[in-house]
């Protein structure tokens, strides 16, 4: 089985400037293995100008601490994500090492990603809300029953380049791909979407617990109502599945789930 890294993505401006979508716990490994992310000869930090966050999951945010040596960072996220990162001490810890410019991301409002010097890049993001009715465990732990926000805990992003009008969608956590969410996937050239679990009862089948995929905020891939068939009925866009749990049989290179996904996603 090939080694897998977390679901962090890098978005380039075509001129060497890079922005990250989320920041996983193994970010330091990814930085070492990706030459475009190496510091230049006159720079002690990687050429990463900012990070846009889909949520406050540790799988998506612990890598922020790997960037603590940066002179300054632009971080984009919703108000709910900022509160959660402050409560779990990730954000205060990062702020004790470097200057963090927090930019509030509001669903439905497009914004340009900024370079470290504050000038806008040609790369833009447009967040859309993907908060489900049942919050993920990390979010439930920080909100008393009935007090959780109804939006902004989880978002996806449409990511584009003002020079080319090409668009990608980044949605690594989604509990239900309903009609509202599917509209944001239209006219995209690439879709990166949640592949945490292959089936809804995967943890039970693997004797790893009783929670279902949907109860944890993740739509399963397989099945008549799974994300694979749902997306294929509505788009022929190239699909990349991301954020795989270690129980997911799609990890096995020649297994039936991998073959079925490969035939459907290309």
Identify the role of each PLM range.
Residues 16-77:
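Active-site metal-binding motif and surrounding structural segment of the metallo-beta-lactamase
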Residues 69-71, 80-104, 247:
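Active-site neighborhood of divalent metal-dependent phosphoester bond hydrolases
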Residues 73-81, 192-194:
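Short internal beta-strands
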Residues 1-36, 40-42, 105-184:
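Core dinuclear metal-dependent hydrolase active-site scaffold
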Residues 43-46, 67-71, 94-96, 184-187, ...:
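Short, conserved loop/helix-junction motifs that constitute active-site signature segments
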Residues 71, 95-101, 120-123, 260-265:
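A short helix-to-beta-strand connector/capping loop
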Residues 151-156, 162-167, 174-266:
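Cap/insert and terminal regions of metallo-dependent hydrolase folds
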Residues 76, 101-106, 126, 265:
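General small-molecule cofactor/ligand-binding pocket signal
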